C-alpha cells in the first residue's frame, strides 16, 4: 500500500471515486493509485496487459514481476492492481476494534484509503475465484507497523470470503519472470512486424529446425532473416512471439539466453 504523493483528504477521496478509480473490470478498471500519485524510487512500471488490454501501473520491480507471473498463468482472467479497501469507514472500524492505528496522511491527518496490490480473478472448475495479494520485500516483513496494516487488510478480505496473502521477493521465481518479461511485448505482433502469414509459417519452420539442431535462437533468427529477405530483427521478434503465445514450448523456468541453444519441446 502506497501513500499518496499529494495531500489526501475527503475531497481527494470523493474526486477519485467520482473518476471511477477502483471500479470496473478488465479493460475498464481504473487503479486507485497511479504512479504519479505515489512517491517513487525510480522503479515504476507501465505495462500493457495481455488479458485486460489496458495499461497497468506498478510501484516496484516486485509488483511488476508478480504481474508477469499472473499474465503467464492460463487460469488468471483479470488483474486489478492497487485495489481500494472501501468503504473507508470499514477499515477504520476494523483498526479501532483491534487496537490498531489506521494509516493517515501526516500532512492532513485524514485517514488514507488502504489498497491491496492485486485483486486477481482465477478460473477454477468452471467458476471464478478471487484472490487478494499484497507484494512486499521480505526485509519489511519484520516491521511491527507493516504487520499491523496487514492485519487490517487481512480482516477486510476475510469479511468478503476472499483468500488474502503476502507475496515477498523470496516467492518470486526470478528466471521465469525474466523470460516472461523478454517475450511479453511480442505476444501480439500486429503492426509491429512487416511480414505476411505465409512468411511467418516459413520463418517458423526454418528457425524451429535450426534451433532443434542446436543453433542458438539469435543465430537461427538472423539466418532466417537472410534467407527470407526479412528486416533485421524480425526473426528474433518471431521467436519471442512464438514463446509468448505458447506456439513453441520451452522450459520457462530456465533463463533463456538467445545467444545459447534452447530445447524446444516436441
Model-predicted segments: where are they?
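Electrostatic, structured charged patches in enzyme active sites and in nucleic-acid/phosphate-binding
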Residues: 1-266
Amino acid at each position: 500500500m502506497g501513500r499518496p504523493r499529494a495531500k489526501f483528504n475527503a475531497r481527494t477521496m470523493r474526486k477519485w471515486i467520482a473518476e471511477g478509480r477502483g471500479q470496473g473490470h478488465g479493460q475498464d478498471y481504473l487503479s486507485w493509485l497511479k504512479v504519479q500519485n505515489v512517491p517513487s524510487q525510480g522503479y515504476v512500471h507501465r505495462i500493457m496487459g495481455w488479458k485486460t488490454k489496458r495499461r497497468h501501473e506498478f510501484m516496484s520491480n516486485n509488483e511488476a514481476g508478480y504481474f508477469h507471473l499472473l499474465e503467464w498463468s492460463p487460469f488468471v482472467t483479470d488483474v486489478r492492481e492497487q485495489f481500494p479497501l472501501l468503504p473507508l469507514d470499514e477499515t477504520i472500524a476494523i483498526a479501532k476494534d483491534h487496537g490498531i492505528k489506521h494509516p493517515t496522511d501526516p500532512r492532513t491527518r485524514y485517514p488514507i484509503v488502504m489498497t491491496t496490490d492485486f485483486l486477481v480473478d482465477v478460473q477454477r472448475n468452471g467458476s471464478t475465484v478471487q484472490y487478494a495479494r499484497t507484494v512486499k520485500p521480505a526485509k519489511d516483513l519484520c516491521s511491527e507497523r507493516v504487520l499491523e496494516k496487514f492485519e487490517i487488510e487481512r480482516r477486510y478480505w476475510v469479511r468478503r470470503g476472499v483468500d488474502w496473502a503476502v507475496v515477498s521477493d523470496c516467492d518470486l521465481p526470478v528466471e521465469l519472470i525474466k523470460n516472461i518479461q523478454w517475450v511479453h511485448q511480442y505476444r501480439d505482433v500486429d503492426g509491429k512486424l512487416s511480414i505476411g502469414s505465409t512468411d511467418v509459417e516459413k520463418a517458423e519452420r526454418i528457425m524451429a529446425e535450426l534451433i532443434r539442431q542446436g543453433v542458438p535462437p539469435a543465430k537461427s533468427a538472423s539466418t532466417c532473416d537472410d534467407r527470407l529477405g526479412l528486416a533485421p530483427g524480425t526473426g528474433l521478434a518471431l521467436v519471442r512471439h512464438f514463446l509468448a503465445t505458447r506456439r513453441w514450448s520451452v522450459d520457462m523456468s530456465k533463463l533463456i539466453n538467445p545467444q545459447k541453444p534452447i530445447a524446444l519441446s516436441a
